[in-house]
Regions:
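Catalytic cores of TIM-barrel enzymes
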Residues: 2-171
Length: 171
């Protein structure tokens, strides 16, 4: 088991991030964490973190940020496909692709590939009423010592999001 050695910290994660965005001096550079499942698992094993526990790993790494999101509670909008995962919000399909590092989920079965305007207009999207905002508020309260963000790197990424639904050739 590997142990991460960190320098003594003199400020909270939230203070560090706020100072960084204000272009003020901090005790260290703020840290975030995002990876695929295979690498996450290997990192947890190496650090002796049981059950691939995400929160324990964030603590071990000294991650300053915590993401929050309201849970989707609405109806199933997209049909399940054998051997695939489907994104419940946007209808993106992924399949497991093995590689020498373990593997990853890659986009496939593009639901709007070759679709005409009418099909695109009729494509279902979740209603804002189908989310548990109270649970998101509780997440925020639990993360009060961290810099909290909503969304993910793909939230504002219109071009890649179109590719996930229409394919690289049609995005």
């Amino acid at each position: 088991m590997t142990k991460i050695r960190k320098a003594k910290e003199t400020m909270s994660a939230k203070e560090r991030v706020l100072r960084t965005f204000a272009f003020e001096k901090t005790d260290r550079v703020p840290i975030d964490y995002a990876t695929n499942g295979s690498i996450h698992h290997r990192l947890c094993v190496e650090l002796g973190i049981p059950g691939d526990n995400y929160d324990l790993l964030l603590e071990a790494l000294g991650v300053d940020y915590r993401g929050v999101a309201p849970a989707y509670t609405g109806p199933l909008l997209y049909p399940p496909l054998p051997g695939r995962q489907v994104d419940p919000l946007y209808g993106f399909y992924t399949r497991w692709v093995e590689n020498e590092s373990g593997g990853y989920h890659d986009f496939c079965d593009f639901p709007l590939q070759g679709a005409d305007e009418e099909t695109i207009r009729a494509f279902p999207f979740p209603s804002p009423d189908d989310f548990d905002y109270d649970a998101a508020l509780e997440q925020i309260k639990r993360q009060k010592d961290y810099a909290v963000y909503v969304g993910n790197p793909g939230t504002g990424d219109i071009i890649n999001s179109l590719d996930y639904a229409r394919s690289n050739d049609n995005g």
